Amino acid sequence: MKKLSFQQIILTLQNYWQDYGCAILQPYDAHVGAGTFHPATVLRCLGTKPWSVAYVQPSRRPGDSRYGMHPNRMQHYYQFQVILKPSPDNIQELYLKSLEYLGIDLKIHDIRFVEDDWESPTLGAAGLGWEVWCNGMEVSQFTYMQQIGGIECRPVAGEITYGLERLALYIQGVDEVRELDWNGQVGEKALKYGEVDFEAEWQFSKYNLELADSEMLLRHFKDSEDQCERLIKANLPMPAYDECLKASHAFNQLNALGVISVTERASYVLRVRHLARICCTKWLEMNK
């Protein structure tokens, strides 16, 4: 198997899905916990208009902060997201062909679809799903998106999320994310993943777990919550959704700090879900 660099894996997936007919979008410029939170998924999976896109999304999960010391868990990582709406009958076959396009021989590697129905409590989103395992390592999530913002997706969209770091660990045959070949160069031009991202990983872990100001984050959450409601009343669901994302990230930061009780956590989840629901509802009203 050819050992593609991290950036070659991204380019290969972009080329594959572009050839299929997907528009290649750019990452969303907001702090999100997963590629699913990009408005190209949350808003565009609603309604009847066909929508086929693919994009890389840098994602942040403050609760996964490990100061860069964990072999494959970070507070900042990358996903490659594909949305096909309506979901084609051969979506599983398309996914498997994308693995072959990456140089993974399906005849000699153990590819398994492990049932794992997906749910995002803060988005009010859910769907039938499977984790995709390659030789015992999870590399992707495969979901039939049935509901977002508490609204049924009609038609159902197919979502494929590649965990780029884990996929690269497998393709390159290394044990730690920091050792991944980033750019495929040799000598002075060679870059490893750790040289690109791990100083930031340590600093943001320090911030997320030790130095973030909980009182400030509580104010930010309430401010974003109020702004979202105000913008919905002004019929502006897209900037309102930005405020929903800000509230969601503030909640994740508070959760990472350990300053929210179990009861409070449930309340915050419901508050973010409400924001997502009103954004999705207003978007659908304006884009039928």
UniProtKB/Swiss-Prot annotation:
The keyword ATP-binding applies. GO terms for biological process: glycyl-tRNA aminoacylation. The keyword Ligase applies. Keywords: Aminoacyl-tRNA synthetase, ATP-binding, Cytoplasm, Ligase, Nucleotide-binding, Protein biosynthesis. GO terms for cellular component: cytosol. It is found in: Cytoplasm. Its main location: cytoplasm. Its EC number is 6.1.1.14. It catalyses: tRNA(Gly) + glycine + ATP = glycyl-tRNA(Gly) + AMP + diphosphate. SUPFAM superfamilies: Class II aaRS and biotin synthetases. GO terms for molecular function: ATP binding; glycine-tRNA ligase activity. HAMAP family: Gly_tRNA_synth_alpha. Tetramer of two alpha and two beta subunits. Belongs to the class-II aminoacyl-tRNA synthetase family. This is Glycine--tRNA ligase alpha subunit. The gene is glyQ.
